[in-house]
UniProtKB/Swiss-Prot annotation:
Gene3D superfamilies: P-loop containing nucleotide triphosphate hydrolases (3.40.50.300)
EC numbers, comma separated: 2.7.1.33
The keyword Iron appears for this protein: no
Protein name: Pantothenate kinase
Main localization of the protein described in the UniProt heading: cytoplasm
Keyword Nucleotide-binding listed: yes
NCBIfam families cross-referenced by the UniProt entry: panK_bact
Residues binding ATP, per UniProt: 101-108
Ranges in coiled-coil conformation: none
C-alpha cells in the first residue's frame, strides 16, 4: 500500500486525505504577496546545514504564510460568529500552530521563519515560538528513570506539563511560563523560564507535537492546534543532514568547555563521523521510524524536502 501522505490511491482504491501540490504550482498561489525580509535576517534564521535563501522563501514560505493568514482570519471570524450565536462576548484566543519533524530535518528553521513572516501580517503582530525541548524531563530525572539514551522519545517529555501550558495559552491566561532548555548544557536550566503573554499566534515546535494522547489521557497537545505542519524528507537524506550538522557542531559549539558534548571536540574526523552515525542509528532513526513519522498523517500540511533541503512539493489536507 503506498504511503498515505503521497496523494496517490491506495491498493483499496481509497484516496489520500491530502492534495499534493508541485512546488511550481504552490509558488504561483500567492503572486501578489510581499513580506519584507532581508538576507541578513535569513542568515540569523537559518539552521546549521539549512540552505534557506530568498528564492525558497518566495516560492514556499510566502504562500504558506498567506495560507496561514487566511486560516487565522477565518478562525477569528468563526469564533466571533459562534460567540454571537451563543449570545456571548467574543474573547480573543491565540491561533496555535504545531511544527513537527525529525531531528536535523529543518523544522526549527521553518518555525523561526514562520514566526518572523506571520508577525509581518497586520492582524498577527504578536507571534511567539516555544519549543518542546523545555518540556523534556531534566537530565537527573531521565537518569533516574533510565531514559537518557531515549532523550527525545515521547516518554522523555513531561507531556502533562506541555498540555497544561498550551491549554492555558489557548484559554487566554494573561501570562504563561514554560521551562527553559539550554542546548549548550543539554538540560533544563533551573529557575529560567520562557514567558508567553497572550500572543496572536503561538508556534509549538518539536519532534513529537503531533503524537496522539498518552495512554489514559483524554486530550493530546495536537488537539489544541488550529494548524499543524510536518517537515518531511527521505530517511537517508535526514541521516546525511544529521551527520553534517554533528560535524559542524563538533568544529564549533562542542569546542566550548561548557558544552555537554565537549568530549567530542577532540575526535578525529573519522571518529566524529562514526559517532554521528552511531547516535543516528541508535537513537534518532528509531525515534523517527517508531514515533515521529507515524504522526505525519495527522498534520494539516506536509512540506516534503529533496536532498538539497529545498521543498519539492506540498501536501495540504483537504477541507
Amino acid at each position: 500500500m503506498p504511503d498515505t501522505a503521497t496523494g496517490h490511491p491506495t491498493s483499496h482504491g481509497n484516496v489520500s486525505p491530502f492534495v499534493e501540490i508541485a512546488r511550481a504550482d504552490w509558488a504561483a498561489l500567492a503572486p501578489a504577496t510581499h513580506l519584507p525580509l532581508r538576507e541578513t535576517e535569513l542568515v540569523q534564521l537559518r539552521g546549521i546545514g539549512d540552505r534557506l535563501d530568498m528564492h525558497e522563501v518566495e516560492d514556499v514560505y510566502l504562500p504558506l504564510s498567506r495560507l496561514l493568514n487566511l486560516y487565522v482570519t477565518g478562525t477569528k471570524k468563526l469564533h466571533r460568529d459562534t460567540s454571537a450565536f451563543l449570545g456571548e462576548r467574543a474573547k480573543s484566543t491565540p491561533f496555535i500552530i504545531g511544527v513537527a519533524g525529525s531531528v536535523a530535518v529543518g523544522k526549527s528553521t521553518v518555525a523561526r521563519l514562520l514566526r518572523e513572516m506571520l508577525a509581518r501580517w497586520d492582524d498577527t503582530p504578536r507571534v511567539e515560538l516555544v519549543t518542546t525541548d523545555g518540556f523534556l524531563h531534566p537530565n537527573a530525572e531521565l537518569q533516574r528513570r533510565g531514559l537518557m539514551e531515549r532523550k527525545g522519545f515521547p516518554e522523555s517529555y513531561d507531556r502533562r506539563a506541555l498540555l497544561r501550558f498550551v491549554t492555558q495559552v489557548k484559554s487566554g491566561v494573561p501570562e504563561v511560563r514554560a521551562p527553559f532548555y539550554s542546548h549548550l548544557a543539554y538540560d533544563i536550566v533551573p529557575g529560567a523560564e520562557v514567558v508567553v503573554r497572550q500572543p496572536d499566534v503561538l508556534i509549538i515546535e518539536g519532534l513529537n507535537v503531533l503524537q496522539p494522547a498518552a495512554s489514559g489521557a483524554k486530550l493530546a497537545v495536537s488537539d489544541l492546534f488550529d494548524f499543524s505542519i510536518y517537515v518531511d524528507a527521505r530517511t537517508h537524506d535526514i541521516a546525511q543532514w544529521y551527520e553534517e550538522r554533528f560535524l559542524s557542531l563538533q568544529r564549533g559549539a562542542f569546542s566550548n568547555p561548557r558544552s555537554y558534548f565537549h568530549r567530542y571536540a577532540e575526535l578525529s574526523p573519522a571518529e566524529a563521523v562514526a559517532r554521528a552515525r552511531g547516535i543516528w542509528s541508535a537513537i534518532n532513526e528509531p525515534n523517527l521510524e517508531q514515533n515521529i513519522r507515524p504522526t505525519r498523517s495527522r498534520a494539516t500540511l506536509v512540506l516534503r524536502k529533496d536532498a538539497d533541503h529545498s521543498v519539492a512539493n506540498v501536501l495540504l489536507r483537504k477541507l
